[in-house]
Amino acid sequence: MSSTSSNPDDGDTTEQSQLGLDTVIKKLEDTILSPMARREDRALTVRGEGQRASPTPVPARIREIVSSSLGEEPLSGLREPPATTSHAREESELLQEELTRLEDLLAQADAEREELASRCHMVSQRLQARLDTTEARLRKSELEHSMDLEEALSRLEASQQRSMGLSQVNTLLRQQLEHMQKANDTLARELTRATHSLVHLQRKLELQESQRLSLRQPRDILPLWRQAKALQTHLAELRASTERGLTDVQADMTRTAQRLHMACLNLDSHLRLTASSMTSDLEQRLREQAREMLQLQGQWAAEKVALQARLSEQTLLVEKLSVQKEQGERAILTLKSDIQRLKSRRSGGQLAVDELRDEVESLHHVLASIKEVAQSDAMCPELAWSSSIEVREAQARLRSPPRSVSPHQRMSPARTSSPTSLHPALQAVQAAIERRQQREQELRLRLESSQEEAAGLREQLSGYRQELRTSQRLLQDRAQEHEDLLGQLEAQRQEAQLSQASVHLLEREKEALETTMEELRAKADIREAETQKLEVTNAELRRSLLLRAEQKAELAQQSERSLRELEASQGRVEQLEEKVSGLRKELATSREALSSMQLQRDILETEKESLHGALAQAESGNADLELLVTRLKAEGMEQQDSLAKMAALLEGLSQDKGTLNHLALQLEQERDQLREQQKMLQQEQAGMREQLTQTGQQLGLIRAERRSLKETCGHLEQKQDHLEKQVVLLGQENAQLREQVGQVTNKKQALEKQLAQSLQDQEAQMDILQEALHEKNTLSEERAQLLAKQEALERHSELVTKEAADLRAERNSLENSLFEAQRLTTQLQTQQEQLEGKAEAAQLARRALQVEIERLKSDWEVRETKLQLHLGQLQQQAAQQEQEAQLALERQELAHTEDLARLHREKDTLSLSLAEEKEAAARWMEQQKELLTRSAADREALQGEIQNLKQERDESLLQLEHEMQQALSLKDAEKSLLSKELSGAHRELERARQEAQNQQVQAEATVTTMTKELRTLQVQFEEAISTHQREADTLREKLREIAAERSSVRREAEELQAQLNVAHERLAELRQELQASEESREGLQREALGARRALEDEVQEKDVLQHSNTELRASIHRAEQEKASLKRSKEEQEQKLLLLQEAQVAAQKEAYELRTRLQELERAQRDTRRKLQERHRQVRTLEAENQRKRQEVSDLQAQVSRDAQHRQKNLQESLELQRQVAEAQAAHDGVQKEVLGLRQKLAEVEASGETRAKQLEGHLCESQRAEQTLQAELCRITRKLQEASNQADSLQRSLDNACSRVHVLEQELAKAEGARCNAEAQLGRLWSTLCSGLGQSRNLLASPKRPHSPTTGSSQTRPGRQRTSPPTRSYSPARWPSPVPVDPKSEVIDVAFVRDALRDLVQGLLEAQQERDNSGIQVANLSSQLSEAERERLRLQSRVEQLQRDLADAEEGQRRAESALQSAQAARALQKEALQRLETEHLASARAAGQERRRLQEQVDTLRQALEESSRPSQSLADKGRLLEQPLQQVLPHSRRDRAERRALREQTTSLRTERARLQGELAALRTRLIQTEQETLKKEEDRAMLGAKKELLLQSLSHLHQEVDGALRQSQQLQVASLKKRLDKEVWQRQQQAHSD
C-alpha cells in the first residue's frame, strides 16, 4: 500500500522537480545567455566526463548533470550508491573547471576595468595638456599684445618727435618771414626817407631861390632848374627800382607761401597716413585677439562637453550597477519559488520530510537573512551594518534546536547544528554583499573624486573666465589708450591746422603788404602825373618869365626853398648814415644770433654726447633687440623719406634765402644808383635854379601840391604806424611761437626724462633709444644746416661790413661832390663884398660851434666817467658773485663732510634700528631734493641776472652807437652849415682866389704829408698786426699740442673702454650661460612638476585604497611602533630644519641689511657727486660769464679810450697806438703766463688722475680675481646641480618602475576580485542546483543522508562596491552525521576542497592587497626621496643664484671701479680749466674711493661669510640625502614593514614644499635685487656719459674762448684803423675849411 500509494506521489514529485530544474536552468541560461549578460558569460564551456571529452557549454552541461541525476530511478539509487559518489566527484571536477573559467572571466573584467581607468587617465592628461596649451596661448597673446602696445607707443613717440622737428622748421620759416618783413620795413623806411629828402630838397631849393632873388641873381635859377630835373629823374628811377624790388619780393613771397603750403599738405598727409596705419594695425591686432579668445572659448566648450560626457559615462555605470542589483533581487525571488516547490515535492516521505523540513527551515532562515540583507542593500547602502546584525540573528536561529515533529527526530539529536556551525551560503552571501558594498563605496569615492575634479575644472573654467574678463578689460584699456593716442593725433592735427592758419595769416599779411605796395604805386603814379603837371607849368613859366619880372621876391623865397631841399638832401645823407647804424645794429643782432646758434650747437653737442653714452649703454643689449631693429627699419625708411622731404624743404628755403640775399644786393645796388642820382641832382641844381626863375607864377600851386604831399606823407606815416603795429603783432606772434618752442623743449626734456626712466626700468624699451639715435642723426643734419646758415649769416655780416665800407666811400664821394659844389661857388666870388658881414657871422657861428663841441666833449667825458662807474659796479657784482659761489662751494663741501660723518654714524647705528635709518635716509633725500631745487633756482636766478646784464650791456652799446651816430649826424649837419657858410664866403671872396689857391696848394702839401704819416702809421700797424698774428700762431700751435695730448688721453680712455667692453662681453656670455642653465633648470622643474602631479594623482587613488584598507592596517601594531619612531625622527629632523632655517634667515637678514646700507651709502655718494658736479658746472659757467663780462668791459674801455684818443691829435694818436701795442704785448704776456699756469695745473691734475687711475686699476684687478673665484664656485655648484639632476632622474626612473609595478599589482588584484566574485556566483548557482537534485535523490532513500552545505543566493551577489563590513568570523564546516553508512567522507572531501580553494583565493587576494599596499608605500617612499632630491636641487639652485648674486655684486664693484675710472678721466678733462680748489675736491674723491674700496672689501667678506653659512645647510642637506638613499635601498626587501612611513614622509613632503615656496620667494627677491643692481649700473653709465659730455663742453668752451679772443683782437684792429681813417678825414676837412676861410 505504501508502495502503490507512493508511486503517484513520486511521479508528481519527479514532475515538479523536473519543472523546478527547468525553471532553474532557464534562469541560469537567462543570467548567462541573456542580452544583458557579458560576452565571456555566454562563451563559458565545460569539459564533459572524461579527459578526452569535448568542451560543452555550461548550461548544456548543467542540464545533462541534472537530467542524469533526476532520470535515475530511486531503486537504482538504492542499488548503486557508488555511482552517486562518482557522479559527485565528477560534479566537483566540473565545479573546479568552472571556477577556473570564472577566474579567467574575472581577469578579463579586471582588464576591462583597467582599460577604463587608463582611458580616464588619458582623458585627464589630454585635459591637462589642453589647459597648458591654452595657458601658453593666453600668455603668448598677452605678450604679443604688450609688444604691439610698446610698438604703438614707440611709433607715437616717433610721430611726436617728427612733429617737434616740423614745429622747429615752422619756427625757422617764421623767422625767415620775419626777416623778410624787416627787409620790407627797411624798404618802406627808405621810401619815407626818400620822400622826406624830396621835401627837404624842395625846401632848400626854395630857400636858395629866395636868397638869389633877393640878391638879384637870376643866373642861379638855371642850376636850380637842373637840380630839380635831376631830382625828378632820380625819383623816377627810385620809383622804378622800388617797383622792381617789390615785384621780386612779391614773387619770393608767393614762392615761399607755395612751398609752405606744400610742406603743410605733405605733413598733413603723412600724419593722416601714419594715424590710419596705426589705427588699422591696432584694429587688426584687436580682431586677431578677439578671434583667439573665441577659439579659446570654443576649446573650453568642447572640453566642457567632454567632461559632461565623462560624467554621463559614470552615471551610466551607476545605472548598470543598479540594473545588476535588480537582477540579483529577481534571482533571489526565483530561488524562493524554487524552494517552495521543493517543499511541496518533498512531502512524500516521513523521514525525508523531517529532514527536508529541517533543511527547508534552515534554508528558509538563510534565505530570509539573505533577503533581508539584499533588501537592506537595495534600500539603503547605509543599512549594511543592520543587515549584518540580522544575518547574525539568522545564524543564531540556525544554531537553535529545531522543533520536533516525530519521535525519530527526538531520537536523533545530531541533527541540531553545532553552535559554531554556519551555513556556507550565508557566508558567501555576506562576503559577496560586503564586497559589493566595498565596490559601491569605491565607486562612490570615485564619483566624489570625479565630482571634485569636475568642481576643480569648473573652478579652472571660472578662473579662465576671470582671466578672459581681465584680458577683455585689458583690451578695453588698450582701446582706451588707442583712443587717447587718436586724441593725441587729433591734437597734432590741430597743431598742424594752427600752423596752416598761421601760414594763412602770413599770406594775408603778405596780401596786405601787396595792397600797401599797390597803394604806394598808385601814389607814385599820382606823383608822376603831378611832376608832369609841374613840367607843363614850368614850360608856361619859362614863357611868362620875361613878362613877370615883378615876382623876384617870390623867386627869392623859391630859392630859399631850394636851399631847404638841399638841406633835406643832406638830411637824407644823415638818414643814410642812420641806415648804416641800423645795419650795424642788424650786424650786432646777427652776431647775437650767431652766439645763440653757437650755444644751441653746444647744447646739441652735449645732447649728442649724452646720446653717445646712451648708445654705448644700448650696445650691450643690442643682441636682444635685433628683432625690434628689423621691425623699426621700415619706420626708419619712412623717417628717411620724411627727412628727405624736409631736406628738400630746407633746400627750398635756402634757395629762397639766396634769392632774398640777391634781392638785398639788388636793393643795395639800387641804393648806390640812388646815390649817384643824388650826385646828378646836385649837378643839376644849377639847371633847376634857372627853371625856378620861370616858376614864380605857379608858387601857389606848388604850395598846394606841397600840402598834398604833406598829406600823403601823413598817410604814409599812418601806414608806417600801421606797419609798425603789424610788426608788434608779429613780434607778439613770435613771442607766442617762442613760448611754443619753449613748451616743445619742455616736452622734449620730459621725453628725455621718460627715456632715462625707461632705461632704468627695463632693457625692453631700448627701441626708444634707437629712435632717439635716428632723431640724433636728424639733429646732426639740422645742425649741419644750421652751421651752413651760420656761415651764410657770417657772409651776410661780411657783406654788411663791405656795404658799410661802400657807404663810407660814398660819404667820401659826397664830400668830393661838396668840394665840387664849392668849386662851383668860386664862380660867384663877385658877391664877396656883400657877404663880408655874413663871413663875420659865420665866424661867430663857428665859435659857437666850437663852444658846443667843447660842451659835447665835456658831456662825453661825463658819460665816460658814468660808464667807468657802471663798469666798476659790474666788476664788484661779479666779484661778489664769485665770493658767493666760493662760499656756496665751501658750504657744500662742509655739508658733504658732515653728510659723510652722518652716514658713518648711521652705518654704526644700522644694526640697532633699520626703521630709523630709513626715515633719516628719506629726510636726507628730501633735503637733497630741496637743495637741488634751491641750487637750480639760484642757477636760474644767476642766469637771469647774467641775461639782464647782457641785455643792459647790449642796450648801452646800442645807446653809445646811437649817440655816436647822432654826434656824427650833428657834425655832418655842422659841416653842411659850414659848407654853406664857406660857399657864401667864397661868393664874397672872389678877390681872394689867388690866396685860396695858395691855401689849397698848402692844403695839398699838408695832405701829402698827412698821407705819408698815415702810410708810416699803417706800416707800423701792419707790423704790429703781423707780430700779433705770429704770437697767435704760436698760441695756436701750443693749443694744438694740448689737443694732441688730449687726443692721446682720449685714446688711452678708449683703450680702457675697449677692455671694459671685452669684460662686459664676457659677462654677457656668462649671463647667457646662466640663462641656459636656468632654462634647463626650468625644464627640469617642469618635468618634476609633471611627475609630481602624476604622483599626486596616484597618491589620491592610493588614499582611496588606503581608506578601504584601514581596518586591515589597524591589526598591525608593529607598523604603529615604527610609525612612532619615524615620527620622533621626523620631529628631530624638523627641529634641525627649523634651526637651519632660522640661521639662514638670520644670515639673509644680515646680508640684506648690509646690502641696503651699501646701496644707501652709494646713493648718498652719487647724490653728493652730482651736487658737486652741478656746483662745479655753475662755477665754471659763472667764471666763463665773468670772463666774458671782463672782455666786454675791456672792449668797452678800449672803445672809450679809442673815442678819447680820436679827439686828440694825430701825434697823440700815434703815441696811443704805440701804447696800445705795448698793452697788447703785456696782455699777450699775461695770457702766456696764464697758459703756463694752466699747463702746470693740468700737469698736476693729470698726475693725480694717473695715480687715481692706477688705484682704480688695482681695484679692478681685485674685483676680477673675486669674479674668477666666484666663477669657479659657480662651475662647482653647476656640477653639483648636474649630479643632483642625475640622482633625481634615477629616482624618477625607480619611481616609474614602482608605479608600473603598482599598476600591475592593482590589475592583478582587480582580476582576482572579479574572478572571485564570478566564481562565487557560479558556485552558488551550481550548488543550489546540485543541492536540489541531490535532495530529491535522497528523498527516496530509507535513511537520511547528510546534506551538502549549499551556497545559494549567489545570483544576487553581482559585483558592486560598497562600504566595508566588519570582518566575518570563520566557522567550522557544517557536518550533519546520518545513521546510514554511505561513505560520507567523499562528500566532505569535496566540500572541503571547495572551501580550501575559496580560502586560497581569499588568501591570494589578501596577499595581492598587501603587495599593492607595499607597492604604494614604496611609491610614497620614492616620491618622498624624489621630493628630497628636488629639495636638494633647489637648494643647490639657490646656492647657484646666491653665487650669481655674488657675481653680480662683483660686477657691480667692477662697474663702480669703471665708473670711478671714467669719473677720474672726466675730472682730468674738467680740471684743465679749474682752479686750485679742485685739488681738495680731488683729494676728497680719492678718500671716497678708498672708503668705497674698504666698503667693497667688507661686502666681499660679508658675502663670503654668507656663502659659508649657506654652504653649511647645503652640506647638511647633502648628508641627509645620503642617509635617505640608504633606506631607499632597504625599502624594496622590507616593503611590508614601511607602511606607516608613508604618512610621515607625506608630512615631510608638505613641509619641504612649504620650504620650497619660501625659497622661491627668496629667489624672486634676489632677482629683484639683480634688477636693482642692473639699474644702478645703468645710472652709473649715465653719469659716465654726463661726465664725458661735460668734458667736451669744457673743450668747446676753450675753443670758443680762443675764437672770442681772436675776434676781439680783429675788432680792435678794425676799430683802430677806422678811427685813424676818421681822424685823418676830419683833419683834412678841417684844414681845407681853414684854407678856404683864409
Swiss-Prot record:
Residues 67-82 have a biased composition (Low complexity). Keywords: Coiled coil. The keyword Coiled coil applies. Residues 1180-1193 have a biased composition (Basic and acidic residues). It comes from the Eukaryota. Belongs to the rootletin family. Residues 1-21, 39-92, 396-423, 1168-1213, 1338-1383, 1506-1551 are annotated as: Disordered. The keyword Coiled coil applies. Residues 85-144, 426-1234, 1281-1315, 1412-1506, 1542-1576 form a coiled coil. This is Ciliary rootlet coiled-coil protein 2. Residues 1-20, 406-421, 1349-1371 have a biased composition (Polar residues). PANTHER family: CENTROSOMAL PROTEIN 2, CENTROSOME-ASSOCIATED PROTEIN CEP250 ISOFORM X1. It comes from Mus musculus (Mouse).
